[in-house]
C-alpha cells in the first residue's frame, strides 16, 4: 500500500489542472508546468482535490503510484508558491556575482566559473557569499543548486567550499606532529 500515493492533493486558489490523455498541465500564478505520466495511472480531479488511482496492486504499479502523486504535488506547489534553494560560500576570496542571467563564481580556481541560468530559473545574490536558486520546477531547482555546489564542494579539513544553508559538514582532524 502506498501511503503517499493515497493522499489527496488539494489545489490552492488560482491553480488550474488539465488532463489530456495523462499529459498533465498545471497553470498557476507563478507559471505553467507540463509533464507526461504513466498511461496506467488514473488521475482524477474533483473540484479542488486531485486523487491518483492505480489499476491494480502489482509491484510496478505500487512503485509508480507514490512517485506520480509526489511529482503531481510538486507541480501544484511549484506553480503556486515556487521552490528555492539557498547556498553559502565559505573560504577566503570566494565570491559570487550576477552578470545578467549568468552567475559568476570565484572559488579559488585560476579562472572564474560561469553558470548560465536554465529556463525558468533565477539566481539571486544577496551578498557576495550567498546564492539563491529559485524556480517553479523542483527538479530543475535542485539539479541547478547541486551543480553549483559541485563546482567546489566543501572539503573536510577546513570546510571551504559551496554548501547548502544549514548543511552540516563534518570536519576531520589534521595530521598530528611527532
UniProtKB/Swiss-Prot annotation:
MF (Gene Ontology): rRNA binding; structural constituent of ribosome
One GO term (biological process): cytoplasmic translation
Alphabetized UniProt keyword annotations: Ribonucleoprotein, Ribosomal protein, RNA-binding, rRNA-binding
Coiled coil: none
Highest taxon above the source species: Bacteria
Pfam families: Ribosomal_L6 (PF00347)
rRNA-binding as UniProt keyword: yes
SUPFAM superfamilies: Ribosomal protein L6
GO cellular component: cytosolic large ribosomal subunit
Protein family membership: Belongs to the universal ribosomal protein uL6 family.
PANTHER family: 60S/50S RIBOSOMAL PROTEIN L6/L9 (PTHR11655), LARGE RIBOSOMAL SUBUNIT PROTEIN UL6M (PTHR11655:SF14)
Protein purpose: This protein binds to the 23S rRNA, and is important in its secondary structure. It is located near the subunit interface in the base of the L7/L12 stalk, and near the tRNA binding site of the peptidyltransferase center.
Oligomer status and interactors: Part of the 50S ribosomal subunit.
Record's protein name: Large ribosomal subunit protein uL6
Species the sequence originates in: Streptococcus pyogenes serotype M1
Record gene name: rplF
Amino acid at each position: 500500500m502506498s501511503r503517499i500515493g493515497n493522499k489527496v492533493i488539494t489545489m490552492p486558489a488560482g491553480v488550474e489542472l488539465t488532463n489530456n490523455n495523462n499529459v498533465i498541465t498545471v497553470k498557476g500564478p507563478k507559471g505553467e508546468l507540463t509533464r507526461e505520466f504513466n498511461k496506467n495511472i488514473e488521475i482524477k480531479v474533483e473540484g479542488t482535490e486531485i486523487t491518483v488511482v492505480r489499476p491494480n496492486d502489482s509491484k510496478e504499479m505500487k512503485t509508480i503510484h507514490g512517485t506520480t502523486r509526489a511529482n503531481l504535488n510538486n507541480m501544484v506547489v511549484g506553480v503556486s508558491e515556487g521552490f528555492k534553494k539557498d547556498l553559502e560560500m565559505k573560504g577566503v576570496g570566494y565570491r559570487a556575482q550576477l552578470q545578467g542571467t549568468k552567475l559568476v563564481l570565484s572559488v579559488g580556481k585560476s579562472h572564474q566559473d560561469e553558470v548560465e541560468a536554465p529556463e525558468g530559473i533565477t539566481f539571486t545574490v544577496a551578498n557576495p557569499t550567498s546564492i539563491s536558486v529559485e524556480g517553479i520546477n523542483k527538479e530543475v531547482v535542485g539539479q541547478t543548486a547541486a551543480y553549483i555546489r559541485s563546482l567546489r564542494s566543501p572539503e573536510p579539513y577546513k570546510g571551504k567550499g559551496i554548501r547548502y544553508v544549514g548543511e552540516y559538514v563534518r570536519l576531520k582532524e589534521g595530521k598530528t606532529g611527532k
